A protein has these predicted regions:
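C-terminal motif of bacterial Sec signal peptides marking the signal peptidase cleavage site
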Residues: 15-17
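Positively charged n-region of N-terminal signal peptides that target proteins for export
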Residues: 1-4
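N-terminal pro-sequences and low-complexity stem/linker regions of secreted or lumenal proteins
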Residues: 19-328
């Protein structure tokens, strides 16, 4: 058995060496699908503050909720693609939302809508179109929980502007005045992806985690195969970290927008297209496909429901569907 684990570990480290700009995963056994839900373990030191549990019968009260977001691919370009075998293994092994629709085009207003409940009339990938409004992080902090966004290849915490592989338009948090204009808050919560391993090692992972790959690993500028290889390493890192504490978690894999303009759920008739969204958790149904129509606002609404937070913007709309069917 030890020889088998060492062989698997060597394979994982070899993959990591081929992707030098990725966050370096801790020394762990490489993830296969059966490891995504770790065996029951005990812990005496939680990763994040444990708020008072919120009684809820609709959505589980997860200790950690993670969003990992990729770029610009329609559902049919991802599901069934031989270039994304790992993503498709996860999609077939856990819960796949088959009718999830992005908010609009281009990228930025989709990101903004995921945490703000609105596009705030942003119609471009502007870098100076800041918003003075309440966002999901405000509500998370008010509930006694913590949050961070980990941005791959961001030069330093709270960085303004874009670089070669980090682009500001894929970081919605920096656009909200209450975050950006509070220097201490911004520096603590908008951080490079390299900070993830530091937080894992110190057992200080926040309750809400938003991970943006760089412009290559998100499949924006590079191929789906590179995004898939990056995802495999990232999933290994996250799941082993959560498994070490046995804290309930939900990982949401999604895409900012598709390549079409399909719509649902009260969105404009011409919206952001159909995207592939996968829910991964010990508390989701396995091998399940949910054909309920959802939008990005549904993700925001579901996070709010899980943690007893107020609904922001269009998350409160009756047409915005709450994600219920996938939970065990």
């Amino acid at each position: 058995m030890k020889r088998t684990l060492l062989c698997l570990l060597s394979a994982s480290l070899l993959m990591a060496s081929c992707l030098p700009s990725l966050v370096t995963a801790p020394t762990v056994v490489p993830l296969n699908v059966t490891q995504v839900v770790p065996a029951t373990q005990t812990s005496t030191q939680p990763n994040a503050p444990t708020p008072t549990p919120v009684p809820n019968v609709l959505v589980p009260n997860f200790q950690h909720i993670v969003i990992v977001i990729f770029e610009n691919k329609e559902f049919g370009s991802v599901i069934g693609s031989p270039k994304m075998p790992y993503f498709n293994i996860l999609a077939s092994s856990y819960t796949l939302l088959t009718e999830h629709y992005a908010t609009t085009h281009p990228s930025l207003p989709n990101y903004i809508s995921l945490i703000g409940g609105d596009t705030f009339d942003i119609k471009s990938d502007c870098e100076d179109c800041y918003v003075n409004a309440t966002s999901l992080p405000d509500l998370i902090e008010q509930s006694g929980r913590t949050w961070k966004t980990y941005q791959e290849n961001m030069p330093e915490a709270c960085h303004l502007g874009s670089t070669l592989r980090y682009v500001q338009k894929h970081n919605p948090f920096i656009y909200f005045d209450p975050i950006r204009l509070n220097a201490e808050r911004c520096a603590q919560s908008i951080v490079p992806l390299t900070q993830l391993n530091v937080d894992i090692a110190s057992k200080s992972l926040p309750n809400f985690i938003f991970i943006t790959p760089d412009i290559c690993h998100s499949a924006h500028d590079c191929g789906l195969d590179q995004a898939d290889a990056w995802l495999k390493i990232m999933m290994n890192t996250l799941v082993v970290a959560f498994g070490a504490t046995n804290e309930p978690y939900l990982i949401i894999l999604t895409w900012d927008e598709g390549q079409g303009d399909h719509s649902c759920c009260g969105l404009p008739k011409s919206a952001g297209g159909r995207v592939a969204t996968v829910l991964i958790s010990p508390q989701v149904k396995t091998g399940f496909q949910d054909d309920t129509p959802y939008s990005h606002y549904s993700i925001l609404k579901t996070i709010a429901e899980a943690w007893g937070l107020p609904y922001l913007g269009h998350a409160a709309d009756a047409e915005t569907t709450l994600i219920i069917a996938p939970w065990k």
